Amino acid sequence: MEEQVPSSANILVIGGGPAGSYAATVLAREGFEVILLEKDVFPRYHIGESMLPSCRPFLKFIDCEEKLKNHGFTMKPGAAVKLNQYKREGYTDFISTNPDNAARNVVRSEFDELLLRHASEMGVHVYEGVRVEEIHFAPDEPTRPISLTWSKEDKTRGTVSFNWLVDASGRNGLMSTRYLKNRTFNKTLRNVAVWGYWTGTSCYAPGTTRENAPWFEALIDETGWAWFIPLHNGTTSVGVVLVEEESKRKKSQYRSECKDKSPSEIQHDCYMADLQRAPGLIQLLGTATFEGKLMSAGDYSYHATEYAGSNFRLAGDAGAFIDPFFSSGIHLALTGGLSAASTIAASIRGDCTESEACGFHNSKVGTAYTRFLLVVLGVYKQIRSQETAVLYDVDEDNFDKAFHFLRPVIQGCADADEGLTEAELQSTLDFCTNVFAPTQPETHEAAIQRLGSLADPDGPLLDTDTIDKLTGTDMEAKHALWKINARKPLHSMYDCKRNFGTEIINGFYVKMEQGVLGLVRT
């Protein structure tokens, strides 16, 4: 950690979480001068412990993969998801085709510090304990940031000017909330999370290839879901996510029934009662012991209307947040970080205009967000067992970019109509929910063998009628094919080099090569 914040910088990054550390590292490895300001002194606590397999190739690109492997974080072979108490759980298998494809469950204080220290080793000038007080803009261009004022706990203050800004300030989202005022909240994902840590739990599917996978379960009263995530430090993260209104209702009921209890006692009682509404999770808890204290946060899903502008980029939670479900947070942080770095490098190197670079970043972050949003909305549709109208929470332009190849499958024809309809979106949600279709590992593998090339994850999408004709009365094959097809829209994002290096957005794709990182015009 460096001490004296300089008075000027070429590229300045606000925030040392995954998005900020990653963007800064990528840019520093390209030879650019980068300083990073982080308000906390690491390590610091953070929630969001479950990762996707996609994080591994992201870290490989910055030579950090081995550090992740060697740290000792808990292996995540897949994820078990029980959305319906009358059906067996679904399972997303990460390692069936490649044992090295396992993800990790991480203690975020350790993972985030690992990334920040790696950034420093790669040449980023890191300053911790530095709070950004105010961002200043060009007089002749009121949305182009040119400097900021910072402060420390010892009352020292200063100003640093810069040419480029990456705002990875987390949910505070300095640029988005204070200056651009372009944050939009999703009405259908206004939730509250309450969680804590347990010791002495059992594990999911011991003695199988699924052993110790995290468990996610819908509550039987349809008010939310619960998570069970084993960690390498001997604890298990156990939390409940509730619809905000249901959370308020339950607390109000407990307060009226238990007037002699404190707010913290009522919160603990509500938490324990909600865990009882997840019978599969209760079995995994067994005789475990609750440790420490409960924590809570408002899990309000939101996005910015734009993630880039003249000489600035938004990345990670500073721009958008979906929901803890599907563990998309770190993936979207790294996606935003890489896109921010790639488009800044492209603009500096003259690969495109700054306006074109901004357009690429806006679309890249927007489509990645929308892909996961649709899966999450599909899951919540099942959890709540109702035809919730969600059209107003999905930007039509981003829907087109995210699922342009999916619309003909949903509609059952080659020509998509002009507009996005509520019926089409509901069909998409149903389709995406098959990511977690319940299958047994042995029969699933047997079905895969019977399907042959149809089971290729990189093959073309198949519509429902085609799947029905191909599988007939073979229900296991039908479920397997539904699941494979539902994962295809997300599958391409799991390999960041392929996704960034081949997906054409607004006539450009990313040149994923260290030293010449940028955009290539098609």
Curated annotation (Swiss-Prot):
Belongs to the flavin-dependent halogenase family. Signal peptide: none annotated. Pfam families: Trp_halogenase. The gene is armH1. Armillaria species are both devastating forest pathogens and some of the largest and oldest terrestrial organisms on Earth. They forage for hosts and achieve immense colony sizes via rhizomorphs, root-like multicellular structures of clonal dispersal. It is an enzyme of class 1 (oxidoreductase). This is Flavin-dependent halogenase armH1. PANTHER family: FAD-BINDING DOMAIN-CONTAINING PROTEIN, FAD-BINDING PROTEIN. It catalyses: melleolide F + FADH2 + chloride + O2 = 6'-chloromelleolide F + FAD + 2 H2O + H(+). Its EC number is 1.14.19.-. Keywords: FAD, Flavoprotein, Monooxygenase, Oxidoreductase. GO terms for biological process: secondary metabolite biosynthetic process. FAD binds at G16, A19, E49, I330. GO terms for molecular function: flavin-dependent halogenase activity; monooxygenase activity. Melleolide sesquiterpene aryl esters are cytotoxic secondary products with anti-cancer potential. Armillaridin shows therapeutic and radiosensitizing effects on human esophageal cancer cells. Armillaridin induces autophagy-associated cell death in human chronic myelogenous leukemia as well as of hepatocellular carcinoma cells. Armillaridin can also inhibit the differentiation and activation of human macrophages and thus might have potential to be developed as a biological response modifier for inflammatory diseases. InterPro entries: FAD/NAD-bd_sf, Flavin-dep_Halogenase_NPB, Flavin_halogenase. The keyword Oxidoreductase applies. Flavin-dependent halogenase involved in the biosynthesis of melleolides, a range of antifungal and phytotoxic polyketide derivatives composed of an orsellinic acid (OA) moiety esterified to various sesquiterpene alcohols. The halogenase catalyzes the transfer of a single chlorine atom to the melleolide backbone, resulting in a 6'-chloromelleolide product. The enzyme acts on free substrate and does not depend on carrier-protein-dependent acceptor molecules. Chloride binds at S328, G329.
